[in-house]
């Protein structure tokens, strides 16, 4: 693990010591190199001795998320260049350092082998994100958004700490690799039901579960571009990852407790998709679509069959790349028009034809067009939920239809129609933006050729 962690730490002095005109290029190139090292972890042999130590271990669930995290840093840096072009030099360096610090915490969270260590790092990711949102956001509401973000996450995760101490007392260890072999199950007592709720609530808020999701649209809308990208792509996956790690420890309690949460997720999935159909704000629409996709992941994790786990991991990776790409596109619109309202940006297809092609591809991956891994993930989840209960197929079908509707609605409102006169003298799309879109789409397309490397713990 250190062969990723140490280079990531060294990116911070690299940023502060670079020449002013080389900051972006240095960090981006070295970030890409680190992400190429992390691809090594995707090859998981059966005797997984190479990748485990006392502090860190990686298995086939954390490896894809690790690769996604490291892949995102250079993309965030590429996307932020225009946003920070007017800032003084030290502030640029501070911004890049925050992103690197956040990536460091995330890498360590996904590979921590101890539950308390995992908890500390899970909370530590909050700090750089909060600074990025409240310092570099666009509107003044960003302070409000930061407050929501902080308090929702903290309120959710404090009971988890108490629950972990209790589990440590009960089982004698909190090491992931040791607890897997613990034979004695937790009985269905009232105290253990509260224990389950305490464990799950932190991750449900992070996912977010419908009803606990109010911080997400706020944080997404107010965050700068890199904040939105990392929030949608990786921070939401922390919730899914934590749930997949902890639900297996708490059986048979999970089977007993899962019903209300699954109902809430299935209901919330349709509700948030319907909210998307009425949005005027572009970033808000993408944020709500994230909530509905993550509701699918919650359902999959709570069903707890091999198929649903495969679907959940595939969907998490696919959604990470897709939503990040959509935020980049929304940001490139925002940099030209200085408004997030979709109607004001209509008719862009005639002015920026290549950008319209990227919009089309991003919308199609968002609505899970057949060859993409989004579809593979959704199919696995739909099949496993159908075998769990036949009625869910109706809800899933409605949700998939509404997803297709709002994705196409987003595409049509931003790209088609007659353009308004205030955007005639718009800047053309930069090579940087096209490269950014290519680097988002490339993994999606390549993974659809060989999806089994991201199907998680079963393979």
From Swiss-Prot:
Record's bilayer topology term: Multi-pass membrane protein
Keywords (A to Z) from UniProt: Electron transport, Membrane, Mitochondrion, Mitochondrion inner membrane, NAD, Respiratory chain, Translocase, Transmembrane, Transmembrane helix, Transport, Ubiquinone
GO cellular component, as recorded: mitochondrial inner membrane
MF GO annotations: NADH dehydrogenase (ubiquinone) activity; ubiquinone binding
Cell location: Mitochondrion inner membrane
Swiss-Prot/TrEMBL catalytic activity: a ubiquinone + NADH + 5 H(+)(in) = a ubiquinol + NAD(+) + 4 H(+)(out)
First-listed, main subcellular location of the protein, grouped into a coarse class: mitochondrion
UniProt key word Transport: yes
Coiled coil residues, start to end: none
SUBUNIT field: Core subunit of respiratory chain NADH dehydrogenase (Complex I) which is composed of 45 different subunits.
Free-text function comment from the UniProt entry: Core subunit of the mitochondrial membrane respiratory chain NADH dehydrogenase (Complex I) which catalyzes electron transfer from NADH through the respiratory chain, using ubiquinone as an electron acceptor. Essential for the catalytic activity and assembly of complex I.
Annotated family: Belongs to the complex I subunit 4 family.
PANTHER family given in the database record: NADH-UBIQUINONE OXIDOREDUCTASE CHAIN 4
Protein name according to UniProt: NADH-ubiquinone oxidoreductase chain 4
Originating gene: MT-ND4
